């Protein structure tokens, strides 16, 4: 079925996945709050990433670096001078756009070219396309544009009691630099030999010119990043390894491979620090969008921090007796983006035999579902006994307890929030200590001893 973004956003708000930020005060543009189900879903996504990329990896370990860092970090990394987007303003609407995204949206929506990439084009090349194609502002419908200029994406603030340049600091625009500046601390304290990786999950902030598409592009967002260090010359081999590993992680959590593609960056599109980058893209209802960037950052970051800090980041190879600055592969994934992708991928509307109404269902992998099961007493008279099952299971799983309305309406409600199993406690349960377990996807029902529920859910939530 063709999926509509407005319908998915409406469901997310209605069912408590995501709410507009500061809603009672009219909101704040491009801010979103995760509701009770959204925070469970996103936490499960982060848990699944950490499990496979850190806990179960023989190579990788984790850290949690500070959001606020010495400004010299951003000077060394190049963010102060190079972390910019091409900005263009429409003189009539007074609205500001990212020039590259304005062109890409036009090429996709008007020309039908989903593969056109403007990133990497010069200002002159982008302005020529805008002028030659007669691209207009979506609001004013005019082509009365300013010249394209650079716009730095970093949020600036001040530390201390006075707001002057000596106290100027920045909210981090990426989590990666917190890993690079801790490279020696981690490598020495954990006695790691190459190859090895350092991963973390954390908030980052970018003053995006044109954020949008719900939680896909926001100014405050969460990243799940791994910096994997290896011997120079082995970086492409490891980049291919992490491309496959990342793709397999997505499909192991039931993301449809038909909605995924790998796209290699052209040479003129590569970031200044990269000699190879591949994006894993997902086909959202609004078009293809980047989920995961897997970049070979060479030795750029460690070398720059060595130059600016005076620290020696060379690795002494015990096998060859060489000294060299390691190369780095960075698989960088947006937690909000991939949560949105799992939400879009799971959404479905299905016809039900014997009913004229379609059911809305979220086909989440059980490991990601906000609730692993819902306990449903057939009658409120049975709630006292049914709640005991909730208490038994909720120490290990996220479980819902729902006793209101008919059992059919409760099934539909649980389908709509992606609960994989409904456990119905009926009057027979009082006698035989068994319950009816309904599968969300097949709608099939089986009778099961209460004593087997924990083992059943443990097995089903593996991935």
Curated annotation (Swiss-Prot):
Its EC number is 6.1.1.14. It is an enzyme of class 6 (ligase). It holds the Pfam family HGTP_anticodon. GO terms for biological process: glycyl-tRNA aminoacylation. Keywords: Aminoacyl-tRNA synthetase, ATP-binding, Cytoplasm, Ligase, Nucleotide-binding, Protein biosynthesis. Catalyzes the attachment of glycine to tRNA(Gly). This is Glycine--tRNA ligase. It comes from Staphylococcus aureus (strain bovine RF122 / ET3-1).
């Amino acid at each position: 079925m063709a999926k509509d973004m407005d319908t998915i956003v409406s469901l997310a708000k209605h069912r408590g996945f995501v709410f507009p930020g500061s809603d009672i005060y009219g909101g704040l543009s491009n801010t979103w709050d995760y509701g009770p189900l959204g925070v469970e879903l996103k936490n499960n996504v982060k848990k699944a990433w950490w499990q496979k990329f850190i806990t179960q990896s023989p190579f990788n370990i984790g850290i949690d670096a500070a959001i606020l860092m010495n400004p010299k970090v951003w000077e060394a990394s190049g963010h102060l001078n190079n972390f910019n987007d091409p900005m263009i303003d429409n003189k009539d609407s007074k609205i500001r756009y990212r020039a590259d995204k304005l062109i890409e949206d036009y090429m996709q929506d008007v020309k039908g070219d989903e593969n056109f990439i403007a990133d990497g084009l010069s200002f002159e090349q982008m302005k020529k396309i805008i002028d030659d194609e007669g691209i207009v502002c979506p609001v004013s419908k005019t082509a009365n544009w300013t010249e394209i200029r650079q716009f730095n994406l970093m949020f600036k603030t001040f530390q201390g009691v006075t707001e002057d340049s000596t106290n100027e600091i920045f909210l981090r625009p990426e989590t990666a630099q917190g890993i690079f500046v801790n490279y020696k601390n981690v490598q020495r304290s954990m006695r790691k030999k190459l190859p090895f990786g350092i991963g973390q999950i954390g908030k980052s902030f970018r003053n995006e010119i044109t954020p949008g598409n719900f939680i896909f592009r926001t100014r405050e967002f969460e990243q799940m990043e791994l910096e994997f260090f290896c011997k120079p010359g082995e970086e492409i081999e490891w980049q291919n390894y992490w491309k496959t590993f990342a793709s397999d992680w997505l499909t192991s959590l039931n993301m449809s491979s038909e909605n995924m593609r790998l796209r290699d960056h052209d040479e003129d599109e590569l970031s200044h620090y990269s000699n190879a980058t591949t994006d894993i893209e997902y086909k959202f209802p609004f078009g293809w969008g980047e989920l995961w960037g897997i970049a070979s950052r060479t030795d750029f970051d460690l070398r720059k921090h060595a130059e600016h800090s005076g620290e020696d980041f060379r690795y002494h190879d015990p096998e060859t007796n060489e000294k060299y600055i390691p190369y780095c592969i960075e698989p960088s994934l947006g937690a909000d983006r991939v949560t949105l992708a799992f939400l879009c991928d799971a959404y479905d509307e299905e016809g039900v035999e014997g009913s004229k109404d379609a059911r809305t269902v979220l086909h989440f992998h059980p490991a990601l579902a906000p609730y692993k099961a819902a306990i449903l007493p057939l009658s409120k008279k049975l709630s006292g006994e049914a709640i005991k099952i909730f208490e038994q299971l909720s120490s290990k799983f996220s479980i819902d307890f729902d006793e209101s309305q008919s059992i059919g309406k409760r099934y539909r409600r649980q389908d709509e929030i992606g609960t994989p199993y409904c456990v119905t406690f009926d009057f027979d349960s009082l006698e035989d200590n068994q319950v009816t377990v309904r599968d969300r996807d097949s709608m099939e029902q089986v009778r099961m001893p209460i004593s087997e529920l924990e083992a059943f859910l443990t097995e089903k939530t593996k991935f």
